[in-house]
Curated annotation (Swiss-Prot):
Enzyme class of the recorded protein, top EC level: oxidoreductase
Residues at the active site: C103 (proton donor)
The entry's keywords: Flavoprotein, FMN, NADP, Oxidoreductase, RNA-binding, tRNA processing, tRNA-binding
Matches recorded under Gene3D superfamilies: Aldolase class I, Putative flavin oxidoreducatase, domain 2
Name the record gives this protein: Probable tRNA-dihydrouridine synthase
Catalytic activity: a 5,6-dihydrouridine in tRNA + NAD(+) = a uridine in tRNA + NADH + H(+); a 5,6-dihydrouridine in tRNA + NADP(+) = a uridine in tRNA + NADPH + H(+)
Chain's gene name: dus
UniProt record similarity statement: Belongs to the Dus family.
EC number: 1.3.1.-
Tagged with keyword Phosphoprotein: no
Pfam families assigned to the protein according to its UniProt record, in alphabetical order: Dus
Cofactor(s) needed: FMN
Signal sequence region: none
Annotated source species: Rhodobacter capsulatus (strain ATCC BAA-309 / NBRC 16581 / SB1003)
GO MF term (any one): flavin adenine dinucleotide binding
Amino acid sequence: MTISLDSLRLDPPVLLAPMAGITDLPFRRMVARFGAGLVVSEMVASGEMLTAKPSVRAKAQAELTAGLPTSVQLAGREAAPMAEAAKIVADMGAEIIDINMGCPAKKVTGGLSGAALMRNPDHALRLIEAVVGAVDLPVTLKMRLGWDEDQLNAAEIAARAEAAGVKMIVIHGRTRMQFYTGAADWRAIAAVRAAVSVPVVANGDITDAASARRALDQSGAAGVMVGRGAQGAPWRLAQIAAALFGKADPKLPSGSEFSDFVSEHYEAILSFYGRDLGLRIARKHLGWYAEAAAAPLRAEMMRATDPAATLALIRSAFSEREAA
């Protein structure tokens, strides 16, 4: 099974979700090493892209080493800045532009972007049309089922987005007001699937092959998008692809290979962000990798401020660990 977006093929149809502060270039490269159909950048605010700040532009870097298509996700409330940001991102090497209409965070919806766009479909469609018209790239859309249980309008917006030129639609099976509580309603995604002919991808609570299979069965979707399930497990998408789509089983790191892998990711973060910011960002990834480690060792790793000391702790924590 393959998802086609114009000339691009997303094979396998197991995609990495955009996650703010997580799916940066170092993490996307780690996922790409094991395999995925697509990796998506963390959300980039369109207005900030126009400022040319290096820290913002870094979020939209698209260079990978495994030949995977890369999508850059843009968020914003107004059509013109979104269109201009899309042009910039295209010039930087993105192969796909994704529009964020699903982020539930108050700091995003309070600015009338993210999932808040679902409350005003006419305005959202003007924004979508502007982005589609600005670039010669496939444009995709990620959204939720609706704002709340009284506004379940994902199918309506999806149909209009397809007419505007959107090539793929990803649905997180919750409303904005649910945030991440309760369970994702994969069956509700089927209504969106029935409303459009472009590929629909299921997202939300997909953490392993079993949940991916249930999501596909219940939604009828063309593929799955994995977010939190990949935290601390960049190989998770490849495992799902092997179980469901006949891809080769990924070779998972174990023993010294595992500590080498975590060390490489840690050093890549420091190289990308610089020492001080990199130390802060690396801690969450180390925390996910170290969930099975002894509590005192894990706590010491979270407190460490010296890279050499942290690398020694990584070797101590992971030298006998096996990926799962």
